């Protein structure tokens, strides 16, 4: 508890609107306005523990000034400070920023001196505004004699009103004071006893009763619970000890009585709850008895409710007739009969389906839709342009049967979120139907009701859950459906996605037609090949390419890092990740088309930071019991747009505990050392390609997968044998044939390539060749490895190394022609991702490079191949063939 403090003649003044700080009370405030920040810097921050400020209550100008005297502005002083002399009944009035209206600040003439127990400084991001968090302890009362404006804040000449030791000794001789003190302590002990029973606290408060003078106890107790502003002012103005004790006893007793009344109400409510629980158990027993007797009135009531619900569902006439027939059948059945439950569940489904309920479409704002797409997704310019075109057609002709969009691309490039953005732009509800791993046609069409455990298909169930007949429905992973003896889900989707047929979609469980023509379908897939051609014909494929490293870095800074920080309860005050570190993560730890692995790595860093923050004993969440105050004078220097957040500290809290609890932790900055500690050693190395092609017989190819483009190494080795070719690496038939073609072409041109001496005929005589595709657990197939295979064989047999900065793709024929291949865009992006500088492509794939970002092409040298003479570009020092040889 604070000892007597000698106050200076002048204090810096901080105004509290409709709130009073009493001596002995401890509060936490947050200062954000320029005036309060300046006050804290000048009076507290620079003076450290010696700093004192005055807390003076103020009230709104609209409130009556009769309760508290007010101050008004006077003339200037020699020191340049504006003088404001104290006179009752007047106010501080001034023109704000040259405006004609005037603001009146009603200052109370008494305040409380306070000292800072703890002071911390912070900077808000991104504004850079400086804020202070201060823990203040009220010391003693004072009277405001003169108020002055010093720069951005106020100071006041004060007169202390503290009780002296002589005054206290004299009061203790007064029988009335002794009686009041005894009565106050008795009431306080009763309050502590009640609180101790409710909250298991009060030990430290009892110590206060024995050690703190009674006149200070009065202020401390009153400050510990909520009272009105007028009562707070009354306590502040109670200079006379007997008046103060009398008022404090009254307030403490009133608080005690309110707690006791609340306890009585709580006990009464708990008694009523016990009675309700008893009635509930009896009713449950009564219901069980009625079920045994076959006389259950509750079920009859439920059936009546179901009937009313069906009547209000808005079913078409033919379906309503079917539902009535089923309802009559249900009414004739007893609840114990086997078909009762299934029939009732079926009717509940009919009643819950949105037959007429539909979302009213908002007026399409293409500009807002474009802004939404740009804010949710980075890049994807052509994809977003196609979506805007789709929305423009919907705006001009809402009932148009537009194409069904199918977003195809690697995982993590934003396919699902694009569908959600379309839903938001149209103002419709969004429902996602996952088709991954679906092999049963009944998952789409539903099970027939004759089977036990039958249920509707995923589409009807989704319509029921979303509650409207015109949602945006996402058919996610449509390429992952399979087929077995139970049917082909893709065949069932033919009816769903055909605008001519889905008007009368027939779910096997529902057994009545349902109109799906109002639903906007959007599909996603990783690759097109598994989708059956008839189903693919009903959709418009929009390909989403993988992201470049530069795009990933921008996505991480704009989207991923803020989301990860929010998910882990962090902010930039705890963790900072620079763009350079993000690029390092992309380069060393993720080589993917999308950004999911990048987000996982960022989450790992956030978790590591969360552990360090949580391990700090004093890193506690902000209290929910904060009270927010706004300055009454918006235009004055007192608090221009000021906002002060206050938290009352409980009685008896040790000041050292408060200081320790508010220590500020410096942010954790991610560097290379932290990356290795959290994410482990780098998974990828820019030198990998150079190291793997350092020996002859290795070439670098480019392949396409469902997860985007990848670099594929091809290794060849020769040994003594019988002229056989061995292939390993889990290869398909097409790629095996490409290897045979490559070997045949090399054998036919062995002399031109200087692979055999003049006169030799058989290149393979007495030796075998083994070709291996690393990553043997991954299936590989396709014709695009032809050029890569030839390069590996020529490198092996000529003992010349391939260039480490070059990768290639292309199908080849027996005559040496290089044919175009697919997936060129993803392959080029993969080469750029792996740090490759030169790419050999079929000449007829030139048109496909239009879709590759210019930032990627500017960093690559593209070499076009029409025939196999491009081999010269693949080797260091050129190809070893003879002059004038035509390949």
Curated annotation (Swiss-Prot):
- Its GO biological process terms? protein import into peroxisome matrix; protein processing; protein quality control for misfolded or incompletely synthesized proteins; protein targeting to peroxisome
Q: Which organism is it from?
A: Spinacia oleracea
| SUPFAM superfamilies assigned to the protein according to its UniProt record, in alphabetical order | P-loop containing nucleoside triphosphate hydrolases, PUA domain-like, Ribosomal protein S5 domain 2-like
Q: Which family does it belong to?
A: Belongs to the peptidase S16 family.
Q: Does the keyword Nucleotide-binding apply?
A: yes
Q: What is this protein called?
A: Lon protease homolog 2, peroxisomal
Q: Where is the Lon N-terminal domain?
A: 11-256
CC per GO annotation? peroxisomal matrix
Tell me which residues this entry annotates as catalytic. 784, 827
Tell whether Chloroplast is among the UniProt keywords: no
Q: Where does ATP bind?
A: 409-416
A Pfam family found in this protein is: LON_substr_bdg
């Amino acid at each position: 508890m604070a000892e007597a403090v000698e106050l200076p003649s002048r204090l810096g003044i901080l105004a509290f609107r409709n709130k009073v700080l009493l001596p002995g009370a401890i509060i936490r405030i947050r200062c954000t306005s320029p005036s309060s920040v300046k006050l804290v810097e000048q009076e507290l921050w620079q003076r450290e523990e010696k700093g004192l400020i005055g807390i003076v209550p103020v009230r709104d100008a609209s409130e009556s000034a009769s309760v508290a005297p007010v101050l008004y502005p006077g003339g200037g002083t020699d020191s340049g400070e504006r003088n404001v002399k104290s006179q009752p009944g007047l106010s501080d009035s001034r023109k704000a920023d040259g405006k004609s209206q005037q603001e009146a600040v009603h200052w109370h003439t008494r305040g409380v001196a306070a000292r800072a127990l703890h002071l911390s400084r912070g900077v808000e991001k991104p504004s850079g505004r400086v804020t202070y968090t201060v823990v203040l302890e009220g010391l003693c009362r004072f009277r405001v004699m003169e108020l002055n404006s010093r720069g951005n804040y106020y100071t006041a000449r004060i007169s202390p009103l503290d009780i002296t030791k002589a005054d206290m000794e004299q009061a203790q001789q007064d029988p009335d004071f002794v009686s009041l003190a005894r009565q106050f302590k008795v009431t306080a002990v009763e309050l502590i006893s009640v609180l101790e029973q409710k909250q298991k606290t009060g030990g430290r408060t009892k110590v206060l009763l024995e050690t703190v003078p009674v006149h200070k106890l009065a202020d401390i107790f009153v400050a510990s619970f909520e009272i009105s502003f007028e009562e707070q002012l009354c306590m502040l103005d109670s200079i006379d000890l007997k008046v103060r004790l009398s008022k404090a006893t009254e307030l403490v007793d009133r608080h005690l009585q309110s707690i006791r009344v609340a306890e009585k109400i709580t006990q009464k409510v708990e008694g009523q709850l016990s009675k309700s629980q008893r009635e509930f158990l009896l009713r449950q027993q009564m219901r069980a008895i009625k079920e045994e007797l076959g006389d259950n009135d509750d079920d009859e009531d439920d059936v009546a409710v179901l009937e009313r619900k069906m009547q209000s569902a808005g079913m078409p006439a033919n379906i309503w007739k079917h539902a009535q027939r089923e309802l009559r059948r249900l009414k004739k059945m007893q609840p114990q009969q086997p078909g009762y439950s299934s029939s009732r569940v079926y009717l509940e489904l009919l009643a819950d389906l949105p037959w007429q309920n539909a979302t009213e479409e908002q007026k399409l704002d293409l500009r807002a839709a474009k802004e939404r797409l740009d804010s949710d997704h980075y890049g994807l310019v052509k994809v977003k342009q196609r979506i805007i075109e789709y929305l423009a057609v919907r705006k001009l002709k809402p009932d148009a049967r537009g194409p069904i969009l199918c977003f195809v691309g690697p995982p993590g490039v934003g396919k699902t979120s694009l569908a959600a953005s379309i839903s938001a732009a149209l103002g419709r509800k969004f429902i996602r139907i996952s088709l991954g791993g679906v092999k049963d046609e009944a998952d789409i069409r539903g099970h027939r009701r004759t089977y036990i455990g039958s249920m509707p298909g995923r589409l009807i169930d989704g319509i029921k859950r979303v509650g409207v007949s015109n949602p945006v429905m996402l058919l996610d992973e449509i390429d992952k459906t399979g087929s077995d003896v139970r049917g082909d889900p893709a065949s069932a989707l033919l009816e769903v996605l055909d605008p001519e047929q889905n008007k009368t979609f027939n779910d096997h469980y529902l057994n009545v037609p349902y109109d799906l023509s109002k639903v906007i379908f959007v599909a996603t897939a990783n690759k097109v090949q598994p989708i059956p051609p008839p189903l693919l014909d009903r959709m418009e494929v929009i390909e989403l390419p993988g992201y470049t490293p530069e795009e990933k870095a921008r996505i991480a800074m704009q989207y991923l890092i803020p989301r990860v920080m929010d998910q882990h309860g962090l902010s930039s005050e705890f963790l900072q990740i620079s763009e350079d570190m993000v690029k390092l993560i992309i380069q060393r730890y993720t080589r993917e088309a999308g950004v999911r692995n990048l987000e996982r790595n960022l989450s790992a860093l956030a978790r590591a930071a969360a552990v360090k923050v949580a391990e700090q004993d004093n890193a506690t969440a902000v209290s929910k019991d904060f009270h927010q105050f706004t300055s009454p004078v918006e235009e004055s220097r007192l608090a221009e747009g000021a906002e002060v957040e206050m938290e009352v500290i409980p009685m008896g809290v040790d000041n050292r505990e408060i200081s320790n609890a508010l220590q500020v932790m410096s942010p954790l900055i991610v560097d290379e050392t932290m990356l290795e500690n959290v994410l482990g050693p780098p998974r990828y190395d820019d030198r990998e390609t150079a190291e793997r092609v350092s020996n002859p017989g290795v070439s670098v190819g480019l392949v396409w997968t469902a997860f985007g483009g990848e670099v594929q190494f091809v290794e060849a080795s020769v040994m003594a044998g019988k002229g056989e070719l061995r292939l390993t690496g889990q290869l398909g038939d097409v790629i095996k044939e490409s290897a045979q073609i490559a070997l045949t072409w090399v054998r036919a041109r062995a002399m031109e390539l200087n692979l055999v001496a003049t006169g030799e005929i058989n290149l393979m005589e007495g030796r075998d060749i083994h070709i291996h595709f690393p990553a043997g657990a991954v299936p590989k197939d396709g014709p695009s490895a032809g050029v890569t295979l030839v390069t590996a064989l020529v490198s092996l047999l000529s003992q010349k190394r391939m260039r480490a900065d070059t990768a290639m793709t292309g199908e080849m024929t027996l005559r040496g022609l290089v044919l175009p291949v697919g997936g060129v865009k993803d392959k080029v992006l993969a080469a750029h991702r792996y740090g490759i500088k030169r790419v050999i492509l079929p000449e007829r794939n030139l048109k496909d490079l239009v879709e590759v970002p210019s930032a990627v092409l500017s960093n690559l040298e593209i070499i076009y191949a029409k025939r196999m003479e491009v081999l010269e570009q693949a080797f260091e020092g050129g190809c070893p063939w003879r002059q004038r040889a035509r390949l």
